[in-house]
Amino acid sequence: HGWLLENKDADKTMIISHGRGVNRLAAMQYLQIFKDTSLDKEYSFFIPDLRNSGKSDISRTKMGYCFGQDIYNTMLMLNEKFGKNNFVLYGFSQGGMGSAIAAKIFNNGLRKKGIKVDKMIIDSSISNIRKKVKEDAKKRRVPKFIVSVVVRVFNFRVGNKLDKLRLSYLLRRIPTLIIQTKSDKATTYGMLMEEYNEIAQNKNVQLKVFERGSHTRIYAEQDYKEEYTEAVANFLKDKEVNSAQEETNEKNIQEAETVKVEADENANDKGSEYYEKFSDFDFDDNE
């Protein structure tokens, strides 16, 4: 299920993928970015209901792995039915991780169909699924010996690919803009920077960090709307998102260490109204 906003003159299609616990309506507001920057003429847009949301079947999302399968199948469907073969993936939270998974893990299937992922934008994404599973277990005070079993079961359910489900592996080849707020309690800035540090020298990957704003709600912050819009537009127009990218990288890497310490101290604080909607640590229930 999803909405296709077709632009006959555009040769690229943007897939805007929501996070867990919401549906395609949550992604609709981001169309305004493209109207405000006159980029709406450059793309067709497809906004899907990924599994476990909206009109799609109820099922497990496995921290975004299953969203990756959905986004991959969405590209195949748009290729088969509408002849679309050039995509930009724009995803939030698990939809961000799913976008990265679709482009990298399922790349061979895309190539066979002549499908190309041109660029990606990921906002408030999970950055390392193994660490996220362990973090969620810690928040729920699951005993350590059970956590190791849970991780093994989870790895089995994602086709023994758990060690690949991290941004430092998934993001290298495709030009990508990572958007993150330092105050995100669901997908923490500290965890993201651990991944980003490994790929910070890769010119294909750009990072835009905001001081405030909650999980997947940076654009909704009135003070940031213009800056967020400009970052997305500049990235899509092949301009530098941060004028002093290297300086920003150094500053962010240093600050991430501080944030990580604070995050560890508050490991049992769910703190965000979106936490329960976001957390996917229920994958082993009722199956």
Model region roles, listed by residue range:
Residues Y30, T188-E198:
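Short alpha-helix in the alpha/beta-hydrolase fold that links the catalytic acid
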Residues I101-N160, Y169:
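Hydrolase active-site cap/lid region
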Residues S183-T187:
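Acidic catalytic loop of the alpha/beta-hydrolase fold
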